[in-house]
Amino acid sequence: MSKIPQHYPGKKRSAPRHVFIQQAKKKKQTNPAVYHGEDTIEEMDSTEAEQMDTEQATNQTAEAGGGGGGGGGGGGGGGGVGNSTGGFNNTTEFKVINNEVYITCHATRMVHINQADTDEYLIFNAGRTTDTKTHQQKLNLEFFVYDDFHQQVMTPWYIVDSNAWGVWMSPKDFQQMKTLCSEISLVTLEQEIDNVTIKTVTETNQGNASTKQFNNDLTASLQVALDTNNILPYTPAAPLGETLGFVPWRATKPTQYRYYHPCYIYNRYPNIQKVATETLTWDAVQDDYLSVDEQYFNFITIENNIPINILRTGDNFHTGLYEFNSKPCKLTLSYQSTRCLGLPPLCKPKTDTTHKVTSKENGADLIYIQGQDNTRLGHFWGEERGKKNAEMNRIRPYNIGYQYPEWIIPAGLQGSYFAGGPRQWSDTTKGAGTHSQHLQQNFSTRYIYDRNHGGDNEVDLLDGIPIHERSNYYSDNEIEQHTAKQPKLRTPPIHHSKIDSWEEEGWPAASGTHFEDEVIYLDYFNFSGEQELNFPHEVLDDAAQMKKLLNSYQPTVAQDNVGPVYPWGQIWDKKPHMDHKPSMNNNAPFVCKNNPPGQLFVKLTENLTDTFNYDENPDRIKTYGYFTWRGKLVLKGKLSQVTCWNPVKRELIGEPGVFTKDKYHKQIPNNKGNFEIGLQYGRSTIKYIY
């Protein structure tokens, strides 16, 4: 295939020699998990000069020397102080060849990194406090369900995670991809660290004034490790909103790498005791029981598993070219439910007058067998002859989608957890009768995010929540302050508090790619001998009791994978090392059949002083750094073919309130630079599934 043309052609100056040295080192890297075939897409940096002969460049490498050596699929290069490496590219290129669409996503971020609080590995229990003094006659649900207790390993390393759609595409690019393609596949991924800058901080006090001085430290270093073989625990950051930022012109920071310590912890429950009175009352005092089984310790470090590259100011690091092997992801959505599959019944439309398609008078008469009691030809559930055959009890070829038994909460090694199932577009059950309430099936979800991942400082969150639901999210005092139009509390901003976070409810509802019929619960179909029901209360009681008796995932169920969700949705994921693999993922549309792209870790090397000790907190020079992260993600898609006659509004379903007439202005910056990245669902092209 021919190379993709550059978007900004122009005269180039000849590149300095170190560029060719870096290119030669990239070609020399060898690792079975990294793709080394012939490049069919242009080089990652569109501003690089044409490649020299490998042998010639290698000879120059011997003359000039370089930075850190390659390891774990990547390699370091020497750029030299004062020589900038790479560029700043955040464009997305679309190229259509016949029926295929090639999408090349370039991403660049300025990444800030601090020293970790300690260079030690820490293992601790988190998320639980024990109150042994407060006596309660009722148990709070938090004791059993809303439990944060866990044991984790906190490392001194930071993970540079680009596994989210918002890192690679602008809102316009994502919209163009989902309207242009009916299906997409991941092809390759490249990452690079350039322009490493490390500084030290010196603070002096003169009287009551404090002064900070920042100096370049040319001998300080940045450690880089690439887990190509995925030896370490796999920890995608997208589900917690801790990937690289989504706004290219804003600096971002990596999150600290940590993982669950999978030791067995016996769960803690409150100790319930009877009060010594004549009245039969109960009193509960929390008395947690904690026991750790030492046989299950599994402490893993980066230093003894992955070769580490050392970069100084001006050096760079390249991960090599990774080739994906995963199933394609559809970008289609269907309105068909189980009841819409197959050949509709034979009918005779009414022709008395002209009716609109939306009119309830636009009806038809079903054609039944003469002499029978409303009986049609065909295959139906039930064994009673001569009784009515209807659309309700017709046998369908498949079950489209399935419901998961809600509020069944299993307990694992370290506590309880929700084992939620897929969420469909219409996931409510409905009792019969005019006053029937909707009973939600499967779990609803939400996503919390900050300003660097699409939030807007000027958005009043409380205004976006219905009045009757505000008490679920805010205290009475906060609601009272809002009602009194008091100014927002802005200092100090508490990270991920209600002041500095935004919430998108219903995410990712788009992972359900079809409608499912609402379910009416009737005892008549479940218990023989009962002929009538009291509406609507008896029906609603039945619905409440039978929520766990819906169809589950079984051989006749057809179910789609999750679709892309912009901007917070995860892109790819790893399969668990189990004999029987799961067939779908709750977060990512792409599950790698081979090893996924290796996790990229960075850490500032200890910058010691003249005073040395073996304590857990040795003397260190206060150091920070920043570097340019660059990446290129290549996707291939199939050109979308819409079969319907009428034009369709592809973003009719699932688009957030930011796309409405009164709020559309929030997508572009105001006079303070604040704007909001709207939620987009990737599966929006209408298509029949049967």
From Swiss-Prot:
Q: What does the entry list under GO cellular component?
A: host cell nucleus; T=1 icosahedral viral capsid
**Function field:** Capsid protein self-assembles to form an icosahedral capsid with a T=1 symmetry, about 25 nm in diameter, and consisting of 60 copies of two size variants of the capsid proteins, VP1 (10% abundance) and VP2 (90% abundance), which differ by the presence of an N-terminal extension in the minor protein VP1. Capsid proteins are responsible for the attachment to host cell receptors. This attachment induces virion internalization predominantly through clathrin-dependent endocytosis. VP1 binds DNA and may therefore play a role in viral DNA encapsidation.
Q: Give the family, as the similarity comment puts it.
A: Belongs to the parvoviridae capsid protein family.
| A Gene Ontology BP annotation from the UniProt entry | symbiont entry into host cell via permeabilization of host membrane
Q: Which Gene3D superfamilies match?
A: Parvovirus coat protein VP1/VP2
In this chain, composition skew of type Gly residues spans: 64-80
What this protein is called in its record is Capsid protein VP1
Which ranges of the sequence are coiled-coil? none
Subcellular location(s): the record lists: Virion; Host nucleus
Q: Identify the Pfam families for this entry.
A: Parvo_coat
- List the residue ranges of the region (Disordered): 1-80
Mark out the compositionally biased spans (Acidic residues): 40-53
Keywords on record: Capsid protein, Clathrin-mediated endocytosis of virus by host, Host nucleus, Host-virus interaction, T=1 icosahedral capsid protein, Viral attachment to host cell, Viral penetration into host cytoplasm, Viral penetration via permeabilization of host membrane, Virion, Virus endocytosis by host, Virus entry into host cell
Q: Does the keyword Membrane apply?
A: no
Q: Which GO terms describe its molecular function?
A: structural molecule activity
Q: Which cysteines in this chain are paired by disulphide bridges?
A: none
